[in-house]
Amino acid sequence: MNLATSAETAAAAPQAEGNTPFYKLGGHETIQRICNRFYDLMDEDPAYAELRAMHAPDLAKMRHSLAGFLAAWSGGPRDWFQDNPGKCMMSMHKPFVISKAVAGQWSDAMKRAIGDAGIENADLAKAMGGVLEEMAQGMARD
């Protein structure tokens, strides 16, 4: 399964409803479940302490923003791109010094969250985790 890896690709005209990873994953409900689990893991598991320290104490805004990005990125409603014109995850994280270790924490927590989301299509879930891991590793600067 091929998923978009850039904001430019993801911002292209959406496909017909039901034909994109967003809909195949289960839509907003599944995307929000992934994001909530991701941030819960970051809050609860000491393995993600360095990653957690890079975020504000209140993760509510991040939960909403990441869910919006993942929805748009995976072929759902384009609201995140319309609300953040010209931005992508890479440009938004440029001010942060992200090590390979922190990128690894991010991708591990995200893959766990995807795995815990109860996605029926295991191949799609694995592909999503893999592409997001590549994106996270692409932000590392060491």
Feature-to-residue mapping (PLM):
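Short glycine- and Lys/Arg-enriched binding-loop motifs that mark or flank ligand-binding interfaces
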Residues: 22
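Short, glycine/acidic-rich hinge or "gate" loops at secondary-structure transitions
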Residues: 124-126
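Heme-based O2/NO sensor domains and their adjacent alpha-helical segments
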Residues: 5-19, 32-119, 128-129, 133-138
